[in-house]
Regions:
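Structured core elements
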Residues: 16-18, 61-63, 98, 120-122, ...
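Flexible, glycine/threonine-enriched loop-and-boundary segments that flank and lead into catalytic domains
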Residues: 98-122, 126-128
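C-terminal, non-catalytic macromolecule-binding modules
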Residues: 127-130, 134-198
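Proteolytic maturation boundary segments
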Residues: 60-110, 159, 178, 182-184
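A general structural signal for short secondary-structure junctions and capping/turn motifs
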Residues: 8-11, 50-56, 63-66, 83, ...
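Conserved small/polar residues in nucleotide/adenosyl-binding loops
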Residues: 199-205
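Extended, domain-scale alpha-helical bundle/helix-rich regions
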Residues: 2-86
Length: 209
């Protein structure tokens, strides 16, 4: 619910609500404000102080075929690029990682800058990789993506100066944490719910359970 208590439960900070109130101001007339403005206030506040993590909502396994077996290296990653005092953290990188299913397309359209067969992308804080092959199950669903990595691109930068346009989030297949993620979207189908007639909705009088 759009109450102060409800906003707090959804992670809104006091500063973001205050900034939102200052931005829209006070008026004597009824007004409709796009909820995206409130979300942007939260985004701007968290961007300054929230520690960063990487996660994949729909994980698909990537096997880096030319990476040494049974080797794990720990890469540096900034906790918050907007705040140097936040320090750094270590990310475990190995032969098997997970990326998000939506970051790969076998037959991509133009201007798709994420991973696809033969295309090179950057793994954030890690290396450049190129897709070589995909493995599918009996239903035709992709279960594994096989890639090559360039060991001279550690940290996400190449020695020869070549650039890639896609940068992917990833997590280690050896050291990851399962999480429950609740994705909230719009609760109403209309920008102004008060203008919608709900007379077609009826309350049932007999219910069998």
């Amino acid at each position: 619910m759009p109450t102060i208590s409800g906003l707090r439960r959804r992670g809104y900070t006091p500063e973001s609500i205050k900034n939102f109130s200052d931005e829209i101001g006070v008026t004597k007339r009824d007004a409709i404000v796009d909820v995206a403005k409130l979300e942007n206030s939260l985004r701007e506040d968290l961007n300054k102080k929230a520690p960063r993590v990487m996660g994949v909502l729909e994980p698909i396994k990537v096997i880096i075929t030319n990476y040494p077996d049974n080797e794990i290296e720990y890469l540096d990653a900034k906790n918050n690029p907007e705040d140097e005092s936040a320090g750094k953290r270590k990310l475990a990188f190995s032969k098997q990682i997970f990326i998000d299913k939506n970051d790969f397309m076998e037959d991509p359209p133009k201007k798709f800058f994420r991973l696809s067969p033969g295309k090179e992308v950057r793994l954030k804080f890690a290396y450049y990789i190129v897709c070589e092959n995909v493995i599918k199950n009996d239903s035709g669903e992709i279960t594994e993506i096989h890639c090559n990595y360039d060991p001279n691109t550690k940290g996400g930068m190449s020695e020869d100066g070549r650039k890639v346009r896609g940068t992917l989030h990833w997590v280690s297949a050896q050291e990851f944490i399962e999480a429950e993620v609740r994705l909230y979207d719009r609760l109403f189908i209309s920008d102004n719910p008060e203008t919608v007639s709900y007379t077609h909705l009826t309350l049932p009088t007999r219910i069998f359970v």
